[in-house]
């Protein structure tokens, strides 16, 4: 076959695939997905061990899902590696032509960006198919849907930080008038990402200066899953927690003396979204479940087990808090653009500098 014939054949195949995708995109309805989902029954899901409240929360989600759609769905859950590793795994599976290991993928902007760039996500007209899903919820249009909103912020123990000395922003942490209260006692996260994203508000030089001052007064490093050490009083304050408001609500419900405050305005925010990877074993059930997680009954389960919710679902804890406190969140598009630009030499150098500062 000549090169021209090969080209024409390839173009014809690509055209046929695009037509097929367009028809599939247009053909989905709630009714057709429910009918197809009833034949699939099992939703395979790999994520962090405590995702959606662990087994108890997932059981509640199964019950609410089946009640809404008249299905007999079961979540076949397995704990897996971190979100970056799971994204890389799905991309490799898709490129090899295999079925992916999880029907759905949960990740924030950075993790979903990895999948988006590799064209690893199913195209689904969520807002067009499901009446309760809005276009605003599609963080990556026709690919991902917001499941819960996680504003970043400072957390501290109110029994150990006097009210008149309490920080109201990240800059207060290194203010010479306030910092003696926690100098040599403050915990900071070991991650570069929260500082790198802070540059969207501050610029790189201001972030590096802040990081140096913060490290100079720090007492140690805490991961985002270790906020209990603030509750216990081992550290009186933590410079940043990736899900600060949800953590505060969770611990306050247990009687813990924890307060969360935003570090910047607008607040640096992680938008955790669900998507359906290409080659999913149970694609109809997966699409239905992604949309279901934005319903009030699904959000109630998240709030019950994790104190998490979407600010875009009316009546949720996050929705009410942000509206009543008049707090503004960083635009998803702003942080998405940051990740979709990829790792420039300048960006990699900046992160390398931050990593070096954190190790001091």
Residue ranges and their predicted role:
Residues 1-11, 18-19:
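Bacterial N-terminal signal peptides that target proteins for export
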Residues 18-26:
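Sec/Tat signal peptide C-region and signal peptidase I cleavage site
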Residues 25-30, 40-60, 272:
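Extracytoplasmic "Venus flytrap"
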Residues 36, 64-75:
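Signal peptide-proximal N-terminal region
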Residues 46-63, 76-91, 98-235:
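Extracytoplasmic ligand-binding site segments that recognize negatively charged/polar headgroups
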Residues 202-207, 217-279, 314-326:
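Extracytoplasmic/periplasmic substrate-binding proteins
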Residues 267-268, 272-337:
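Mature extracytoplasmic/periplasmic domains
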Residues 331-360:
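Conserved C-terminal helix/tail region of periplasmic/extracytoplasmic solute-binding proteins
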């Amino acid at each position: 076959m000549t090169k021209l014939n090969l080209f024409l054949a390839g173009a014809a195949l690509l055209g046929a695939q695009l037509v097929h995708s367009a028809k599939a995109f247009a053909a989905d309805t709630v009714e057709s997905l429910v009918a197809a989902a009833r034949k699939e029954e099992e939703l395979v899901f790999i994520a962090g061990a405590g995702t959606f409240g662990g087994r108890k929360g997932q059981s509640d989600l199964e019950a609410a899902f089946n009640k809404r759609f008249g299905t007999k769905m079961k979540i076949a859950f397995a704990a897996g590696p971190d979100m970056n590793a799971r994204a890389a795994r799905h991309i490799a599976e898709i490129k090899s032509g295999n079925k992916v290991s999880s029907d759905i993928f949960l990740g924030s902007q950075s993790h979903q960006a990895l999948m988006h760039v590799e064209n690893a996500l199913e195209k689904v007209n969520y807002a067009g198919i499901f009446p309760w899903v809005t276009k605003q919820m599609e963080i990556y249009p026709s690919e991902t849907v917001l499941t819960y909103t996680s504003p970043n912020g400072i957390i501290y123990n109110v029994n150990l930080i006097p009210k008149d000395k309490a920080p109201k922003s990240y800059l207060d942490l290194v203010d010479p008038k306030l910092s003696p209260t926690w100098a040599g006692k403050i915990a900071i996260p070991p991650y570069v990402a929260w500082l790198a994203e802070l540059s969207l508000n501050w610029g790189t030089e201001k972030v590096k200066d802040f990081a140096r001052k913060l490290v100079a007064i720090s007492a140690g490093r805490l991961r985002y899953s270790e906020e209990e050490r603030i509750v216990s009083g081992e550290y009186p304050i933590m410079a940043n927690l990736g899900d600060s408001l949800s953590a505060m609500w969770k611990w306050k419900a247990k009687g813990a003396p924890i307060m969360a405050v935003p570090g910047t305005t607008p607040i640096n925010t992680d938008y955790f979204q669900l998507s359906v990877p290409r080659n999913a074993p149970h694609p109809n059930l997966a699409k239905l479940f992604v949309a279901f997680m934005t319903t009030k009954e699904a959000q109630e389960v998240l709030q019950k087990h994790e104190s998490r919710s979407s600010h875009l679902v009316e009546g949720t804890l996050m929705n009410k808090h942000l509206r009543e406190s008049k707090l503004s969140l960083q635009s998803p598009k702003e942080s998405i653009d940051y990740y979709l630009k990829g790792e420039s030499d300048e960006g990699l150098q900046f992160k390398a500098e931050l990593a070096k500062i954190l190790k001091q």
